[in-house]
Amino acid sequence: MADVDNRNRNRRPNRAGQPNPKREARAKAAERHVATVSETCAKDIERSLAGVCEFDGMPAGFIAAMKAKAHAADAAEEQVAEESEAAEVASAETEVAAEPAPAEEATETESAPAAEKPTPVLPEVTVFDASATQTILDNGRGYAQFCDMAVLAFASFTNPGGGYIQGYLGQEATLCANSYLYNVLDKQRKWYGENRRRNINCELYRNRALVVPAVRFDRNHVHAYADVIVAAAPNAKRARQEYRVGDDALLDALRDRIRFVLAICDELGREKLVLGAWGCDNNGFDAEAVAELFRKELASGDFKVKQVFFAVPSTRWDEDFAKFEHVLASFPECNEESYAQVAARAAAARAAEQAQAAAEDDEDDDDWRKYL
């Protein structure tokens, strides 16, 4: 843990001007956790600190792969054009030939199949009603040297751990609470300072990320390792309110950030990736739109990841899990119905069932007046 006094950080008043006891309790628990893991996981922390790497813009390997893919596509189009031209020439020569080709040969020539494009290998996509930590523990490996998984931390662009040490909640804070992630991020204050000074970009932020390698996650005496990709989604809520950024620009920024994260996973060579409702809720993006962006990119065939786990815990105050499940149920195909249409139909069916049940109850009620 950095030599910084955090004791008074968590005493920020709430909106009513009073301290927040629950947040203060979480802040104290966070301080205890950070101090404990700094001793018990000292070697792991040292190893992860030594391996931290920064990404500023798309990884070079991904850019090269996209250029090679575009070149191959152009070459394939040229080949098809040349074959088509050759076929036309051959057809013209056949027409002026003295003897027509036998019927069987002509049939075989006409039915010759065109060259097919190779089918891209797409990942297996699953949506879990679980936290990212639980998904890592259920699907990760227990040895750092065999780590084959990466997890996306829904990061704060300017604050290590997303306010975890101040007692704030969130996906990144939960990851910190079950690992030594904060101990590593707290040492990267130069990177966060650079983000604050130069890269806010109308609250859209930029394609900048940290990767903390092979972080150990623990819960209930079970542990697993995963690389943590620390990247921030655009803050749509602030971008709309403070800079009048339009919806199309917001979605374009998020799409580019999603490609950035998937490209980093490719660069790391990890076969498994834990994602989630990134950019939703406090950041202001609709979960259905976010899920659709993820679906399009994962179905594009541009990425090498083999298994993608969407960890989206269901809650009482949002429909993120239901929306992600709806959009990705037919992966890689697009779901033709919107979530609103499906939800409206389900609500109408429930209302009809309730009305029918109420009518049956009325019919069964015996009129007491006939016994007078």
What role is predicted for each listed range?
Residues M1-L372:
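Macrodomain-like recognition of ADP-ribose-binding/processing modules
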